[in-house]
């Protein structure tokens, strides 16, 4: 299952400009590795009946939740729908890869906190992401240099990680660049960068 973080109206603007949506980009990234997957897409913000329009969440092997231009602290009805959908996903799907906005939603749903960046923003590239000792042991960063740059675009950051979460990487702007936590029976991997090459 892929969850689209942007509103339907914003995705239409991307399409009109000839730019891929986050979901389309994720599908291309996955297709690079395998085409032997059945992929469904959900958009909790723009689909009030999202639970009726997809399979039972227990049937999915995993979930990838991508980026968005939304700010979670704005607490709109569309954002609340995403948080609620994430909470249900964390109860019923065993593996979640949460990217950028997706990580912020996953953290919030699990009791963590997100705020505006305090030390600057990423506008194109996140520089000098340092993988810590926990990250070097984690499969998320397998064969990755322990200090790297990657595409990123974010104005917000995780300020409090969920209980029992493990910090995997940081840089000067965002202390939380990568993390891992388990909630219910779900294993959540989160990265702040918008680069989908981690897949």
Where do the PLM segments sit?
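Catalytic beta-strand/loop cores that center a nucleophilic Ser/Cys/Thr
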Residues: 142-185, 190
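A short beta-strand-loop structural module common to alpha/beta enzyme folds
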Residues: 37-46
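Cysteine-nucleophile active-site neighborhood
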Residues: 68-135
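Short catalytic helix/loop segments, enriched in acidic residues and glycine
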Residues: 16-31
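Conserved small/polar residues in nucleotide/adenosyl-binding loops
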Residues: 197-198
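Short amphipathic alpha-helix with an adjacent loop that forms part of the alpha/beta core around
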Residues: 51-59
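Short glycine-rich His-centered loop
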Residues: 2-17
């Amino acid at each position: 299952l892929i969850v689209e973080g942007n509103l339907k109206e914003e995705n239409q603007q991307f399409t009109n400009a000839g730019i891929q949506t986050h979901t389309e980009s994720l599908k291309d990234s996955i297709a690079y590795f395998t085409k032997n997957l059945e992929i469904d897409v959900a958009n909790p913000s723009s689909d009030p009946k999202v639970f009726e329009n997809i399979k039972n969440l227990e049937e999915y092997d995993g979930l990838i939740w991508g980026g968005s231009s939304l700010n979670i602290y704005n607490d709109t009805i569309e954002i609340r729908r995403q948080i609620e959908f994430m909470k249900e996903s964390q109860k019923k799907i065993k593996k979640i890869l949460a990217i950028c906005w997706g990580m912020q939603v996953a953290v919030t749903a699990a009791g963590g906190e997100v705020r505006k960046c305090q030390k600057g923003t990423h506008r194109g590239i996140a520089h000098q992401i340092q993988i810590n000792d926990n990250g070097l042991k984690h499969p998320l960063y397998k064969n990755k240099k322990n200090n790297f740059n990657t595409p990123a675009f974010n104005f917000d950051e995780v300020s409090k990680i969920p209980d029992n979460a493990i910090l995997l990487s940081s840089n000067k702007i965002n202390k939380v660049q990568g993390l891992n936590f388990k909630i219910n029976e779900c294993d959540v991997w989160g990265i702040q960068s918008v680069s989908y090459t981690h897949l």
